[in-house]
Regions:
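Conserved catalytic core of the tyrosine transesterase superfamily
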Residues: 1-212
Length: 212
């Protein structure tokens, strides 16, 4: 279960509970929504002149925000907040995530508990952030990396890097590998969404694993 958040408006707490119990969102996802919604309402407290000018954002009390105040949030407030986030060095992906959290929250107020008749995030569409191409090490760079491993656990770290270089796995996938996932010259990898795939272990991987 997610943490018992107590420093946010009641409606936001209700929404996080809904995400947990009804939508079965992961604790990590819920915590992300919590942080983004908390940041938005700290901003709104400043817009509403309900926070002292010299109060640091992290010290602004949100627990007294009412349903009526939340119902006054407008499309302009949302757009201004996204601009405020950009001015505070939030990149395109971070702003898109914040908008997604707000869209979900206000959608919940409109369609699940009927507190609002209109969603202020409707028709706000951020441009898609540019996707950077993945960067790969050349063969010579890979060899140089392996030759320069300095560790008290050399065999382990060498094996890890060989697997990264040859199997295309993520760190989160690597740390979930168990002995039972190895079979002959293959390894079962569990990726995002618990999707499993079999990856062939080439001779370099097999040698590094055997040495480890």
């Amino acid at each position: 279960r997610h943490a018992p958040y107590t420093d946010i408006p009641d409606l936001v707490m209700d929404y996080l509970h809904y995400l947990d119990v009804v939508k079965l969102r992961s604790p990590r996802t819920i915590n992300g929504y919590y942080l983004d919604l908390r940041g938005f309402f700290r901003y709104m407290m400043m817009v509403w002149n309900l926070a002292q000018p010299d109060t640091p954002p992290e010290e602004i009390d949100l627990t007294h925000i009412t349903k009526r105040q939340i119902s006054t949030v407008t499309k302009r407030d949302i757009i201004n907040y996204l601009d405020y986030a950009r001015s505070n060095d939030n990149g395109a992906k971070a702003r898109a995530r914040k908008l997604s959290a707000l869209r979900g929250f206000f959608g919940y107020l409109c369609h699940q508990i009927n507190e609002l008749s209109e969603n202020p995030t409707d028709n706000i569409n951020l441009g898609s952030p540019k996707k950077s191409l993945p960067k790969y090490l050349s063969a010579s760079e890979s060899i140089r990396l392996l030759k320069n491993i300095q560790s008290d656990f050399y065999e382990r770290d060498y094996c890890i890097i060989v697997f990264f270089l040859n199997c295309g796995m993520r760190l989160a996938e690597l740390i979930t590998i168990n002995l039972g996932d190895f079979k002959d010259d293959t390894i079962k990898i569990t990726g995002k969404g618990n999707k499993e795939r079999l990856v062939y272990l080439n001779t370099a991987c097999q040698a590094a694993l055997e040495h480890y």
